[in-house]
């Protein structure tokens, strides 16, 4: 992680560090371009997507490849794949990869609502029979990537290892450009795991794209059954889940959100519950296809073998991305623990509400949670 690196005094200025940013939203520009009087010399450099990556390279004097990637919802995972390729080819020695999504203009909400993409009930119900769309959310996340041998030699904290990654396209879809394709998704999975030399049936967990749409979820499930889960024994189904049920759909940054969840699953050897899964989608053969949605906290166990997890991410223009992760080397664990910051016990618990009465009621609920043994740090982080 970049914050760990900089906290340890790392300085990458002048280095061959690449920057790869998944970004697509033009909301800020849309808000400001209606009035010609507000356009100034900074309007171009402040609103073009290329600057999202280029400005990071400029501010920190990073000399490697610098590019912004727009493949809609798969942008950040495609950006990570490009970063991996740059490291493998030697174009970069180190790489920052991630994505960002901000919701600042009603355009996307109106358009996606008219396309029946957004949930009228405000819930991402991935793989559930009542799934009726997704909830837009915003955020950003980045990871610092290095070749494994160099990271070990430098004594860096290694959170996980990227064993393989890949990107492809649905191509022409009879249902329209925004309709996913199970055949293309399955083809991508086969190629990624073949190149990585990993049996997909050995996956401990797969973080699905899982938006909770009536069309997308069954299509993704068919691809998973075809390649990853269909040949498993009945007592060892593939565990799947979607972080979108917990934090909403970060769109261009959603692949990175899924990747970070997958990394934490490896580190803790457990998977948190995917929310709002009550009735399995009847369009998915969960039992016959050996799929199980993680509807409660579950431990992961691969026996003596390292845990392996996968991450799916798809764009509504047809660009698919997949990444497979394995656990960090055991030798790294004892020597690379990051010390807890001195201020860790001083994190503020920030509350906000629509009125003073609502704020008081909210504060009361947090007090009750603390009285019942709730962890202050966890509550402060989630508030």
Protein language model annotation of sequence segments:
Residues 1-343, 347-348, 353, 357, ...:
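Condensing-enzyme catalytic core of the thiolase-fold
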Residues 365-369:
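Conserved short hydrophobic interaction patches
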């Amino acid at each position: 992680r970049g914050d760990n690196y900089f906290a340890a005094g790392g300085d990458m200025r002048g280095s061959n560090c690449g920057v790869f940013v998944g970004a697509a939203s033009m909301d800020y520009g849309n808000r400001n371009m209606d009035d010609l009087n507000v356009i100034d010399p900074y309007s171009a450099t402040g609103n073009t997507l290329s600057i999202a990556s280029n400005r990071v390279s400029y501010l920190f004097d990073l000399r490697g490849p610098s590019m912004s990637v727009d493949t809609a919802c798969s942008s950040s995972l495609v950006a990570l794949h490009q970063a991996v390729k740059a490291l493998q080819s030697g174009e970069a020695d180190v790489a920052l990869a991630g994505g960002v999504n901000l919701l600042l203009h009603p355009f996307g909400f109106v358009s996606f609502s008219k396309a029946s993409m957004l949930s009228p009930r405000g819930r991402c119900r991935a793989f559930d029979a009542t799934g009726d769309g997704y909830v837009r959310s915003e955020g950003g996340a980045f990871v610092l990537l290095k070749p494994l041998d160099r990271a070990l030699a430098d004594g860096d904290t290694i959170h996980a290892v990227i064993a393989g990654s890949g990107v492809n396209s649905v191509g022409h879809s009879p249902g329209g450009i925004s309709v996913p394709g199970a055949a293309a998704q399955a083809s991508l999975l086969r190629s990624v795991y073949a190149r990585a030399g990993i049996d997909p049936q050995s996956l401990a967990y797969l973080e699905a794209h899982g938006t909770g749409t009536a069309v997308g979820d069954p299509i993704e499930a068919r691809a998973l059954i075809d390649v990853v889960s269909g040949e498993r024994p009945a007592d060892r189904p593939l565990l799947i889940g979607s972080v979108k049920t917990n934090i909403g759909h970060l769109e261009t940054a959603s692949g990175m959100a899924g990747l970070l969840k997958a990394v934490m699953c490896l580190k803790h050897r457990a998977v948190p519950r995917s929310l709002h899964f009550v009735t399995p989608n009847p369009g998915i053969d969960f039992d016959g296809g050996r799929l199980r949605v993680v509807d409660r906290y579950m431990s992961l166990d691969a026996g003596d073998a390292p845990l392996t997890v996968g991450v799916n991410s798809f764009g509504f223009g047809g660009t698919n991305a997949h990444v497979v992760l394995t656990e960090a080397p055991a030798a790294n664990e004892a020597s690379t623990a990051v010390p807890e910051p001195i201020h860790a016990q001083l994190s503020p618990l920030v509350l906000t509400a629509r009125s003073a009465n609502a704020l008081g009621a909210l504060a009361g609920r947090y007090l009750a949670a603390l009285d019942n043994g709730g962890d202050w740090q966890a509550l402060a982080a989630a508030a």
